[in-house]
From Swiss-Prot:
One of its GO terms (molecular function) is proline-tRNA ligase activity. The keyword Cytoplasm applies. This is Proline--tRNA ligase. Catalyzes the attachment of proline to tRNA(Pro) in a two-step reaction: proline is first activated by ATP to form Pro-AMP and then transferred to the acceptor end of tRNA(Pro). It is an enzyme of class 6 (ligase). Pfam families: HGTP_anticodon (PF03129), tRNA-synt_2b (PF00587). Homodimer. Belongs to the class-II aminoacyl-tRNA synthetase family. ProS type 2 subfamily. It catalyses: tRNA(Pro) + L-proline + ATP = L-prolyl-tRNA(Pro) + AMP + diphosphate. The keyword Protein biosynthesis applies. One of its GO terms (biological process) is prolyl-tRNA aminoacylation. Its EC number is 6.1.1.15.
Length: 432
């Protein structure tokens, strides 16, 4: 992709309304543009990141046998009335009437609708288990939307819902999804801690939140240092992991502790996922019954699994940035390589840049080729800001000797490489 043809509205000045680093960098790098309080347009660069996060999430859901569906963002209110949740959400839920005076709502979540889909189609234990997920925009009318897409009113979520014959099987499915979430965050290039949580308005009695560790996080979390090994070893047995949590009754006032218990780490975290074992709350309220092996009608056991995809875009930035800008993990980067031609009037620079761009593209490595006439300092600032994991820099002096520079955005290390070797060099970088 030629930068001269791309739509990248870079902001030179730091936006005054932005309070957290992710919001500042998303606005400055041309990822998003504010339309109203808590509402943003995702511009080309930001949308590429969003799609890449979606693909990582989708891949891990498919690996555990979850099936993708797409439910409407507008839901009939009668389902929420039937489940008993219609009044609970209060003013956060956007409600309205259609021309026939039917009450509708912009869905903040989908437990009620997925239960309706299940009860109308599945009647026997022989059709279980089932695990359905969708990726859809949601709306909650936050009283004080803030922090950009981190706490917006409109947001993109992945919601999954599992259905099992009994509690034992439901917990087994829950554990598989727990591991799928750990794999997802590993593939996204972030370190996430699973925290025992309250089920809140969803209901149920087993729940975990997943927090990305970031210095700018809103939440303070305390966790066993053994959780750090999950980043590279996500296949550890879930039952073993459960032994790392404190007992439910083991609570401490951190202000009264003279020192932390041995092996406990304190960090800031950003919640990006939440999973719940719901049980039969919705199936009882909405009459989602199945015939068991003895022909008896019983309520199906359910669990719910959410990941905030648009929130993840901001959280990943919070955990991967420096004073110059974003440092994208390769798996979600909008472009894997920034190809920077320092002199578009030098024939050798143009020749090497065009050749490198073509060959990288043939290897399905996404490249943003800076063919603009901007000054070198301006080009470096732009590409450090947008955060491509690698920069290939082509200047007249080294180009004359068929040499290009490769910069690792994360480490800042520069390396001279002969141009005929650059493609293989890039291909051999594991994270690309």
């Amino acid at each position: 992709m030629l930068l001269s043809k791309y739509f990248l509205p870079i902001l030179k000045e730091e936006p005054s309304e932005a309070k957290v680093i992710s919001h500042k960098l998303m606005l400055r790098s041309g990822m998003i543009m504010k339309q109203a309080a808590g509402l943003y347009t995702w511009l080309p660069l930001g949308l590429k990141v969003l799609k890449n996060i979606e693909n990582v999430v989708r891949s891990n859901m498919n690996k555990v046998g979850a099936l993708e569906v797409l439910m409407p963002c507008i839901q009939p209110a009668h389902l929420w009335i039937e489940s008993g949740r219609f009044e609970h959400y209060g003013k956060e839920m956007l409600k309205f009437q259609d021309r026939h005076d039917n009450t509708l709502l912009f869905g903040p979540t989908n437990e009620d609708m997925i239960t309706d889909i299940f009860r109308r189609n599945i009647k026997s234990y022989k059709d279980l288990p089932k695990n359905l997920y969708h990726i859809q925009w949601k709306f909650r009318d936050e009283i004080r939307p803030r922090f950009g897409v981190m706490r917006g009113r409109e947001f993109l979520m992945k919601d999954a819902y599992s259905f099992d014959i009994n509690q034992k099987n439901a917990v087994n499915t829950y554990n598989k999804m727990y591991k799928a979430y750990m794999n997802t965050f590993r593939d996204l290039g972030v370190f996430a801690i699973p925290v025992i949580a309250d089920n809140g308005p969803i209901g149920g009695n087993l729940s975990h939140e997943f927090h990305i560790v970031a210095e700018t996080g809103e939440s303070t979390i305390y966790y066993d240092k053994r959780f750090k090994i999950l980043k590279d070893n996500p296949d550890i047995d879930v039952e073993e992991i459960k032994g790392w949590y404190a007992a439910a009754e083991e609570k401490h006032d951190v202000n009264k502790l003279s020192s932390f218990p041995e092996g406990i780490t304190r960090s800031k975290g950003i919640e990006v996922g939440h999973i719940f074992y719901i049980g039969s709350k919705y199936s009882v309220n909405m009459n989602a019954l199945i015939n068991d092996e003895y022909g008896k009608l019983i309520p199906v056991e359910m669990s719910s699994y959410g990941i905030g995809i648009s929130r993840l875009a901001a959280a990943i930035i919070e955990a991967n940035c420096d004073k110059k800008g974003i440092i994208w993990p390769c798996s979600v980067a909008p472009f894997k390589v920034s190809l920077i031609n320092l002199n578009i009037h030098d024939n050798k620079c143009v020749e090497l840049a065009a050749k490198t761009d073509k060959e990288l593209s043939h290897q399905n490595i996404e490249v943003l080729y800076d063919d603009t006439d901007a000054r070198p300092g301006s080009k470096f600032a732009t590409h450090d800001l947008i955060g491509s994991p690698y920069q290939i820099i082509i200047g007249p002096k080294k180009a004359a000797n068929n040499i290009v520079e490769l910069k690792d955005r994360k480490t800042g290390v520069l390396e001279d490489i002969e141009v005929e070797n650059i493609i293989n060099y890039i291909k051999n970088i594991d994270s690309i």
